[in-house]
């Protein structure tokens, strides 16, 4: 069960009109914190992220099922989204079994270096078109003041890069 503060943060994100993946990010962060605190371990960074996303779906975050994922991942995602609405309590026996299994795993995949490796690997998989679309969406949802600040920062970065190239 997600902590109350995580649910509140996700609700606040939703109220502010932020995307489903931003809301789900709160659950992933909570999962990483749990591993760092030693509540349980994970086999890989990817697993920690997957657990966070699963919890988000079960808490009612409207995350779409991933198109490029394997059939079993898509099935699990669909199952989680349905579980948000079916009102069944989770069986304590199964919950205990999963926690015990995770307790045997390591905390290393939640370290700063592991997360950094995972993030750069994921980022390198994104296409230029994907990045461009994300930037356009960000500009559209930023508002005038935010846009002008972003433009100033971009101009400053361009100038700095130009200066660095001449040296």
Report each predicted region and the residues it spans.
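A charge-rich, low-complexity, intrinsically flexible signal that marks solvent-exposed coils, linkers
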Residues: 1-167
């Amino acid at each position: 069960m997600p902590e109350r503060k995580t649910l509140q943060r996700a609700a606040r994100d939703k109220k502010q009109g932020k995307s489903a993946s931003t809301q789900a990010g709160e659950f992933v962060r909570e999962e990483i914190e749990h591993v760092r605190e030693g509540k349980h371990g994970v086999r890989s960074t990817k697993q920690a992220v997957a657990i966070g996303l699963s919890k988000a779906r079960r808490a009612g975050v409207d995350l779409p099922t991933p198109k490029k994922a394997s059939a079993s991942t898509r099935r699990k995602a669909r199952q989680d989204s349905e579980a948000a609405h079916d009102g069944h309590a989770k069986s304590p026996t199964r919950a205990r079994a999963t926690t015990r299994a995770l307790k045997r795993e390591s905390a290393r995949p939640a370290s700063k270096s592991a997360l950094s490796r995972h993030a750069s690997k994921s980022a390198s998989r994104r296409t230029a078109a994907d990045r461009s679309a994300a930037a356009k969406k960000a500009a559209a949802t930023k508002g005038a003041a935010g846009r002008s600040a972003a433009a100033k920062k971009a101009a400053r970065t361009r100038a700095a890069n130009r200066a660095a190239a001449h040296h």
